[in-house]
């Protein structure tokens, strides 16, 4: 089986997984994984069944928050920014399990928002993330956060490839990438680290 065939099977599986959700609220960081998940769902549903929520605080990059906001605005996807500055005391002592506590606090807040609107809360965790030590994943599992990219078996390189394909096939998504990319930045999001 070729790499393209494998990717197609995984994308078909992702579509099947997402079809099981009534509505989905994506925890949109502005990074490649959550942008891909948002783009893929948008292609399936338009803006009817998807919304995005971005956490903000002193420990988040303002340019990624602005990218997420601009991306959603361009596509007409409902987008909210949730301030999570309150978590700073949880992590200011820099404990060894700070990633767990940080994710738990942030996603506990996001889960409440998702429950208020009756949506599944999904994040951009993918199969490649399982290769690293990431204590924050335990918090996601405890909170029941959906990780459809991981469930579909998609790796980071496959996500980059699929995002590039989507941009080539869908002019609205390609336009959203271009409009929200800072001037002078010529690197497409699927190539960013």
Please place each PLM-identified region on the residue numbering.
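Mid-to-C-terminal catalytic subdomains of enzymes
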Residues: 150, 154-193
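ATP-dependent adenylation/nucleotidyltransferase module used to activate substrates
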Residues: 1-165
């Amino acid at each position: 089986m070729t790499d393209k065939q494998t990717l197609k099977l995984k994308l078909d599986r992702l579509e099947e997984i997402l079809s099981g959700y009534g509505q989905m609220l994506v925890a949109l960081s502005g990074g490649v994984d959550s942008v891909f998940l948002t783009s893929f769902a948008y292609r399936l549903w338009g803006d009817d069944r998807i919304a995005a929520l971005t956490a903000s605080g002193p420990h988040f990059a303002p340019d990624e928050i602005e990218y997420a906001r601009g991306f959603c605005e361009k596509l007409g996807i409902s987008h909210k920014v949730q301030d999570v500055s309150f978590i700073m005391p949880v992590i200011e002592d820099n404990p060894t399990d700070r990633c767990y506590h940080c994710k738990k606090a942030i996603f506990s807040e996001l889960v409440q928002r998702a429950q208020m609107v009756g949506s599944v809360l999904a994040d951009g965790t993918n199969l490649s993330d399982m290769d690293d030590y990431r204590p924050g994943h335990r918090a996601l599992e405890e909170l029941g956060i959906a990780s459809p990219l991981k469930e579909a078996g998609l790796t980071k390189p496959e996500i980059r490839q699929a995002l590039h394909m989507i941009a080539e096939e869908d002019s609205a998504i390609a336009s959203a990438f271009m409009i929200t990319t800072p001037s002078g930045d010529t690197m497409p999001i699927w190539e960013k680290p």
